[in-house]
């Protein structure tokens, strides 16, 4: 039984590391201009990152293989997929005005390095401290909704700045405050997100989906600012 558990534990690490393979093919798809493949690979990367931690805790991987730091492996994979690949995407694409590209890309790299190296990136009351480096979501939004350059410039600049500010960003699945509101609209937004990715929607439907997702992100931002003030004495 112990040998089986050990094999399963190693498989979890391999599963986490498979995100690096996804990252490699994501870079190749960017270079080849195959954004349809990039979109699917980005979603696969999000799925891997979303479940590998739960699997590791369930199988007690840390106890079985103490010589491998699963958290570090996960962070290496995440930095590549959540930060470095989006930087390549935005630098090589036409999603940001040319004169701002390098500044934005440097801002993304440095702000993410700051976030990933923080030991207090997540608070004790289940918030992200500062913008949580979800730059791959910008990749998805730009592929599906063809965001305007000025919209990208403004929103990405705000996210870079808030990476260094101790604002508490809602962790949708864990933050207790406003949970009864956050969970339902998160589920609805995710469903719309998935449908937008894997279905051929009309122009009108895409505009509606875009509006819903923008409102969702606006809610998360405004609610985070409000809750930062409300929980400031914790």
Swiss-Prot record:
It catalyses: a CDP-1,2-diacyl-sn-glycerol + choline = a 1,2-diacyl-sn-glycero-3-phosphocholine + CMP + H(+). GO terms for cellular component: plasma membrane. Residues 1-3, 48-75, 117-126, 171-180, 229-234 are cytoplasmic. Residues 25-26, 97-98, 148-149, 202-207 are periplasmic. It is found in: Cell inner membrane. The chain crosses the membrane at residues 4-24, 27-47, 76-96, 99-116, 127-147, 150-170, 181-201, 208-228. Signal peptide: none annotated. It is an enzyme of class 2 (transferase). Keywords: Cell inner membrane, Cell membrane, Lipid biosynthesis, Lipid metabolism, Manganese, Membrane, Phospholipid biosynthesis, Phospholipid metabolism, Transferase, Transmembrane, Transmembrane helix. The keyword Transmembrane applies. It is a multi-pass membrane protein. GO terms for molecular function: phosphatidylcholine synthase activity. Its EC number is 2.7.8.24. One of its GO terms (biological process) is phospholipid biosynthetic process. Its cofactor is Mn(2+). Belongs to the CDP-alcohol phosphatidyltransferase class-I family. Condenses choline with CDP-diglyceride to produce phosphatidylcholine and CMP. This is Phosphatidylcholine synthase. It comes from Borreliella burgdorferi (strain ATCC 35210 / DSM 4680 / CIP 102532 / B31).
């Amino acid at each position: 039984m112990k040998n089986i558990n050990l094999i399963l534990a190693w498989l979890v690490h391999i599963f986490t590391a498979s995100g690096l393979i996804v990252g490699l093919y994501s870079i190749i798809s960017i270079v080849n201009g195959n954004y349809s493949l990039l979109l699917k690979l980005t979603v696969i990367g999000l799925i891997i990152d979303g479940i590998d931690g739960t699997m590791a805790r369930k199988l007690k991987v840390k106890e079985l293989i103490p010589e491998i730091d699963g958290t570090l492996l996960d962070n290496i994979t995440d930095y590549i997929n959540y930060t470095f690949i989006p930087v390549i995407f935005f630098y090589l694409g036409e999603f940001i005005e040319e004169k701002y590209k390098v500044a934005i890309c440097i801002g993304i790299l440095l702000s993410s390095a700051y976030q990933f190296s923080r030991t207090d990136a997540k608070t004790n009351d289940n918030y992200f401290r500062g913008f949580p480096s979800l730059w791959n979501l910008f990749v998805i939004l730009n592929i599906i909704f063809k965001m305007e350059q000025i919209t990208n410039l403004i929103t990405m600049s705000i996210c870079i700045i808030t990476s260094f500010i101790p604002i508490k960003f809602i962790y949708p699945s864990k933050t207790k405050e406003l949970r009864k509101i956050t969970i339902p609209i998160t589920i609805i937004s995710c469903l719309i997100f998935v449908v937008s990715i894997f279905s051929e929607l009309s122009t009108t439907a895409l505009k509606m989906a875009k509006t819903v997702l923008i409102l969702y992100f606006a809610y998360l931002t405004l609610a985070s600012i409000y809750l930062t003030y409300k929980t400031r004495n914790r």
